[in-house]
Every structure is written in structure tokens, then in C-alpha cells.
Amino acid sequence: MEQRRSGRQKCSKGGEKLIRISQLKLPITHTKAQLEKKIAKTLKNPGNSFTYEIKKQSLDCRHKNDKIFVYTVDVTIRDEQKLAKKVNNNNIMLTKEKPYEFPSPGETPLLHSPVIVGSGPAGLFCGWYLAKAGYCPIILERGEEAEKRQKTVENFWKNGVLDPESNVQFGEGGAGTFSDGKLNTLVKDPYGRNHEVLKRFVAAGAPEEIIYQQKPHLGTDVLVGIVEKMRHEIEEMGGKFCFRSKVTDLIVENNTLKEIEINNDKRIPAQVCVLAPGHSARDTFEMLQKRGVYMEPKSFAVGLRIEHPQEMINMDLYGEPENELLGAASYKVTHKCANGRGVYSFCMCPGGYVVNASSEPGRLAVNGMSYQARDSRNANSAMIVTVTPEDFPDKGVLGGVEFQRDLEKKAWELGEGKIPVQLFGDFCKNQASEALGEVTPCMKGEYILTNVRSVLPKAVGDSIEEGVRAFGKRISGFDREDALLSGIESRTSSPVRIVRDQELTANMAGIYPCGEGAGYAGGITSAAMDGIKVAETVCRKYAAIKNN
């Protein structure tokens, strides 16, 4: 018996027929041989050889003393249809493995290389697939290459020197590079883009387990290497990267894109521009508004980061303070408040850090980040509350941007440029904290004890207090007095949506809004999927440059 590596696929043109087995339950200490034995026993087929691929692995901790992994596997075996009928088991079914297929090029001549604005997941994946198909894309990134960017960010955390163009938000890899690197998504895609994204990450150096894990993640240290590898592959396939190259204007004639201005100076001709600027490209949104690109305000969420000892979270989920096999435990919680608003955890970082994620002078924002090992002493997540355009009426399309900036300015002034921190007990009393309890911060960037609640709108502060107390009834100790709150968490998603039609173009020909910044994704995987989707659209219309 042989386990087919999850990152590989053997597929005939029409797809390979397989037997899918779900609900295979094994102790968390099981071996590969035990899994194979379980598969053979389930199929009532102890003799014949087979190959299998793990499609999903989830953890069941409902019984703390009997924690198990639950698997779904696809099995390749002779006479699979006959065998499936023979075995009377509701957890066994025939399935067909259909590989992802990128479309064939169209016929419209492409006179200039397509330009991609931004090298986050959306821009990077769009660029990779266009390069592979022969379109020689040009990727414009306002920030630095990943390795240089990492040093710039670390210098900011250490010395407080902010580079507005290369920071936690801007630079190769996008904002997700300095996060937990979560890869799970709620987006259901019948075309297989989700699996394709994970495969591409594995090919670029990610652990193969992300293909089937219930909650896959990469970590900042791994992500840096992955985006560098993808950049080199794009360049080898004919693509070009231009760093420190901010798009400052779009030159449009007769409602059609003609040129792109870079750094208020250089202009390049452009027939296709994929706009994937990220959710923090506020100056880009302002430029687009001036140029008449249709945008609309959208809901997003704001709040604070909360820190607890990781051992406390482990105890609640695992029943033990540490488990080497399972790593740091995570949680996901939601609550509907008495005031009608919802409060929920976001971007939970097991064994992670709260980081200063600012990108504008005089304004302060935070985010959560983990390394691959998730081995810091604290767990953190955002406690956020949804805000809608009704919370900033009469402010126009960029009202959400103004709302974010106002909160970040107050946070910067409150902390004098440092991350404002407050104990939950003091938060409930609306008073400044003066001393830490047993929980000590795990932070990147300097912090200061103060009254962070004073920054928040009353409805948001009240919702967070009620939510944390409610979560304390589900996770023991969540509402402890010395849990740490810090802020402001304001960059959860884009405050605008750049309107696009069924052909994925804006109201001006040649402009393709894409990814999280354009309002069509939320997180690394969904942004990458949208990048592939836009690349497909460009490909279906235009002929490849290498074949011209």
C-alpha cells in the first residue's frame, strides 16, 4: 500500500474515478500503517493493493481523554465501482477527481504586457498564472522585496521608524505576510481554484500537510520564502517585478485605459491593468475616485486584540496545558449583543504576537502574527464589531477610510506612537491600566499601558465588553481581569469595493479590480483564488504575448 503524496495528482483527461471514505477515526497518536489498515478494513479489502490521498484531516476534542483525528481519504483501487456497491457503508462513495484547468488564450491582440498593481496573494497568483500562459506580466509593487521588507518592518518594530511605502501592509507578499498565514477559506469554488492555490503553495515550499489540514497555516517565516520562490518562478517564465513602484495615476481616454503613471513620474503603456492594491491602499482609492472609477462603501469591522496565556487556551480545548502532537490550540467565537451588533474573534493567532501594523504617519493599527512554530507564550485574536456605511453617513464612498483613519489617529495620540494596552478589568471600568497582571504582552513594537477604550465608539466598546464576558462562559478564563486588550484593529478588510461587471472589469475598459483591496476576498486563500479568476478572464480574451 502506498500513500500518494497529497500535493500530487494522477488524473486522466476526464478525471480519475476514486472511492471516497469519510469519517475514518483514529487516535491522535496513530501511525501511517494504522491509517492504511483502517482503510483496508473499511473497504473489506485486506489483500488488494491501493493508493490513497488524504483529502481532509480534522481534530475532534470533544472527549478530552480520547482525542481523535477524523479523516476523509480518496482511494484508488481496481474495480472501484464493484467494490463500492459491495460495501454497505454510508461513509463510502464513488467520486471523480477533476483537475483544475486554466483556459486557453483568446484572440484579441495584446500590444503591451498586462500590468498587475500589487504583489499580495491576488497579484502574485494572477501574475504566476499569466506568466505561465505566456503573457509576460509586469507586477508593480509600492513596497520592497520580501527579504528587504522584513528588515524594514523589524527596524520599525525596534526603533519606531515607519516607512509609509514598505511596512506590515505594503510590500511583496501583501499584508498577509505578517499574519498567522491562515489558508482556510469559506469560499466554495466548483472549479478547483482553492485546491490549486494550496498546491501552488506546496510547490513553492509550504508543508504538504496544508493540502488536507482543517485549519492550515504557514506563518510569517515560511511565507517570506514562499513569495520569493513564486517571484523567481514568475521572472523565469517572462514576468517582471518593479519594486518601490507606486501607481499614482491612470491615464484614460474615451473610457479606456491607455497608460499607468508610477511614482508621479514615469508612465508606461497599458491595455490591461489588474488592480490588486490591498485593503490599506487608501491613497490609491483616492486616486481612483478622482479618475471616476466606480467604487462603493462596504461594511468592515473594527475592534481590539485580546491576549491570553496559550496554556489557558490549550487547557480549554485539549484538557492539558501542552500537546506536542497538536501544537497550540485555537478558537473561534461569536456573540450577538443586546445592542443588535455582532462581536466575533478574527485572525486568531495561536502562540502568536500582537504587532504594530501601521502604514501611515501619525496613525496606529495593530494586527496578529504567528511564526510557523506558533510557540510564543500567548494566544491572541481580534475582538471585532461590524460597522456599516450607516455608521459614517454623509461621508461618501471613502467614508470608511475616514472612519478608520480617525480611530487610528486617536490610537496613535493615546499611545504616543506606541501600542495602547489595557487590562480587561480596567477596560470594563473605563479606566487606564497602571500595572500588568499575570498576562504579559507578546508584542512586536513598543507598548504603553493606558485606557484604550477611550478610542472606541461607545457601541463598539460596549459590544466588546459584552462579547468577552459571553466568551468567558465558553472558554474558561477568557474574561479574566488581566487579559490584555490592545488596539486599534482597523484593517480587517477593505472599506470599499471597486465595482466590476460580469467580465470582472471596472467601468473603464482594461481595468480589472482584484483581491481583498478591491473588495472581492477576505484572507490569503480567497485573494489568491480571485487572482487566478482574473487571470483566467484576461486569458480568455487576449492572445498570449509570447505567441504574438
What are these regions (language model features)?
Residues 4-17:
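Short, Lys/Arg-enriched N-terminal segments with co-localized hydrophobic residues
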Residues 16-69, 73-548:
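Residues forming the flavin
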